[in-house]
């Protein structure tokens, strides 16, 4: 089974544009605020963005998918250290003709970004520079956490993008690298770890008011990933 590969990147506090949205949960006797983390998934068409969101949010692989038109999102409520958090995963179109009218909308108030490429298609890997440029060009703060995901690693005989090349790219852009397969049920835990690591990091950040006060005092610190002996990325929870 392919494992998360640790680069030299770090996940850092999101910008003051909004650590998380809030909603009220009335399922309990009293209303409780639930934080919502918006994570967008970006990359070429047919790299498996939709399948990754299905695998994480629903635990399944769709029998049939169609090209995403504009943007779609799925949600999953998770519990981290006793707190319910709603992870909202935005699945974005990879084709230019479907993106133009929606691009500003799905970059707005984003908390984390997942860049996806197909390990069996070198062009999807080389196009990552274009996607990173688009992300940077839409006012996504540089401190918003970003990770790189190589999908379809179950197709071992067709792999065109070697892990060492992808890791070098991830390091150069201060990102963590994960290699996985949305299709292979054995990789479902690996897919979940991508989004859960981001959710854990976002949750670990202090409240906006307290963090902004620290920023004014110059005390905001990076949140670093630790490296375990087996090379896996270690989450804070």
Swiss-Prot record:
It is found in: Cell membrane. It is a lipid-anchor. SMART domains: RAB, RAN, RAS, RHO. GO terms for cellular component: plasma membrane. Expressed predominantly in brain. Weak expression in ovary. InterPro entries: P-loop_NTPase, Rab33A/B, Small_GTP-bd, Small_GTPase. GTP binds at residues 46-51, 65, 68, 94, 151-152, 154, 182-183. A lipid is attached at residues 235, 237 (S-geranylgeranyl cysteine). It holds the Pfam family Ras. Regulated by guanine nucleotide exchange factors (GEFs) which promote the exchange of bound GDP for free GTP. Regulated by GTPase activating proteins (GAPs) which increase the GTP hydrolysis activity. Inhibited by GDP dissociation inhibitors (GDIs). Its EC number is 3.6.5.2. Mg(2+) binds at residues 50, 68, 91. It is an enzyme of class 3 (hydrolase). It comes from the Eukaryota. GO terms for molecular function: GTP binding; GTPase activity. Its cofactor is Mg(2+). Keywords: Cell membrane, GTP-binding, Hydrolase, Lipoprotein, Magnesium, Membrane, Metal-binding, Methylation, Nucleotide-binding, Prenylation. A motif (Switch 1) lies at residues 59-71. The modification Cysteine methyl ester is found at residue 237. Its main location: membrane. The small GTPases Rab are key regulators of intracellular membrane trafficking, from the formation of transport vesicles to their fusion with membranes. Rabs cycle between an inactive GDP-bound form and an active GTP-bound form that is able to recruit to membranes different sets of downstream effectors directly responsible for vesicle formation, movement, tethering and fusion. Modulates autophagosome formation through interaction with ATG16L1. Belongs to the small GTPase superfamily. Rab family. Switch 1, switch 2 and the interswitch regions are characteristic of Rab GTPases and mediate the interactions with Rab downstream effectors. The switch regions undergo conformational changes upon nucleotide binding which drive interaction with specific sets of effector proteins, with most effectors only binding to GTP-bound Rab. Interacts with ATG16L1; the interaction is important for autophagosome formation. This is Ras-related protein Rab-33A.
């Amino acid at each position: 089974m392919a494992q998360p590969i640790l680069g030299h990147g770090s996940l850092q506090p999101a910008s003051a544009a909004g650590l998380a949205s809030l909603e009220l949960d009335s399922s309990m006797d009293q209303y409780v605020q639930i934080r919502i983390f918006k994570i967008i998934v970006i990359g070429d068409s047919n790299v498996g963005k939709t399948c990754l969101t299905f695998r994480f949010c629903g635990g399944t692989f769709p029998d049939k998918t169609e090209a995403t038109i504009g943007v779609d999102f799925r949600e999953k409520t998770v519990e981290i250290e006793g707190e319910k958090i709603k992870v909202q995963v935005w699945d974005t179109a990879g084709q230019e003709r479907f993106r133009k009218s929606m691009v500003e909308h799905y970059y707005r108030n984003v908390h984390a970004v997942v860049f996806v490429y197909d390990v069996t298609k070198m062009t999807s890997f080389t196009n990552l520079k274009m996607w990173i440029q688009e992300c940077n060009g839409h006012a996504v703060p540089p401190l918003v956490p970003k990770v790189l995901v190589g999908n379809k690693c179950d197709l071992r005989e067709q792999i065109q993008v070697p892990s060492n090349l992808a890791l070098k790219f991830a390091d150069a852009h201060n990102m963590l690298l994960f290699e996985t397969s949305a299709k292979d049920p054995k990789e479902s835990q690996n897919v979940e770890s991508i989004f859960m690591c981001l959710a854990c990091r976002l949750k670990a950040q202090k409240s906006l008011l307290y963090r902004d006060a620290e920023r004014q005092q110059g005390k905001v610190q990076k949140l670093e990933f630790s490296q375990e002996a087996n090379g896996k990325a270690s989450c804070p929870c």
